[in-house]
């Protein structure tokens, strides 16, 4: 089966919720890792630092700063060896965190429903898997860029974006030159 972004999007939008509800485990595990980092001293402590009073004056107290805090916090905890599980994507814990927490934080802070969260997380994670399989074994494209692309798709959809806007999010996040078409000039077909 040739996987396309359209197939990923359609799957995330139309699959019965009970069949994909398991994706909430990624949110629970990765958020718990972030929260653990806020309580301890892990790695560079960036997630914890971004929550401080001084940093709020620099970064602000916004959805964006919260996304940065949770995502970097969970990565700090993971990389510093905290005894806490995280959910990976394509074999990488940091990619799993980066495909999950931006979408989760955005959904929570904007009052999105559980169904919307499930579908956005599924879109994010499957987009990462789709892009990774399109890139092949070796790529000059960093895995965290790929994970951020997945998150951008999930957040775009949560903002009311259509399939076309989700596809534009991919193109804006990943240079078009990194992915090649199977039979057309666009990998998004």
Model region roles, listed by residue range:
Residues 177-185:
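Conserved small/polar residues in nucleotide/adenosyl-binding loops
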Residues 1-81:
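Signature of multi-pass transmembrane helix bundles
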Residues 96-112, 152-160:
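Alpha-helical support elements that line or immediately flank enzyme active sites
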Residues 86-100, 144-146:
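Conserved phosphate/anionic-ligand binding catalytic regions in large, soluble enzymes, centered on
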Residues 113-126, 130, 134-147, 162-168:
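Phosphate/pyrophosphate-binding betaalpha-module
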Residues 166-176:
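Flexible glycine/proline-rich, aromatic-decorated loop/lid segments
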């Amino acid at each position: 089966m040739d996987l396309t972004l359209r197939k990923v999007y359609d799957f995330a939008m139309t699959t019965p919720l009970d069949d994909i509800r398991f994706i909430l485990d990624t949110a629970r595990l990765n958020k718990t890792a972030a929260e653990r980092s806020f309580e301890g001293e892990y790695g560079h402590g960036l997630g914890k630092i971004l929550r401080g009073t001084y940093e709020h004056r620099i970064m602000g107290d916004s959805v964006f700063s919260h996304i940065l805090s949770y995502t970097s916090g969970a990565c700090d905890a993971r990389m510093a060896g905290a005894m806490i599980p995280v959910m990976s994507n394509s074999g990488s814990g940091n990619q799993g965190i980066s495909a999950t927490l931006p979408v989760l934080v955005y959904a929570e802070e904007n009052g999105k429903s559980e169904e919307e969260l499930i579908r956005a997380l599924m879109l994010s994670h499957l987009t990462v898997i789709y892009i990774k399989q399109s890139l092949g074994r070796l790529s000059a494209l960093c895995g965290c860029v790929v994970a951020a692309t997945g998150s951008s798709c999930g957040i775009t959809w949560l903002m009311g974006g259509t399939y076309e806007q989700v596809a534009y999010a991919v193109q804006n996040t990943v240079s078009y030159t990194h992915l090649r078409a199977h039979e057309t000039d666009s990998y998004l077909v």
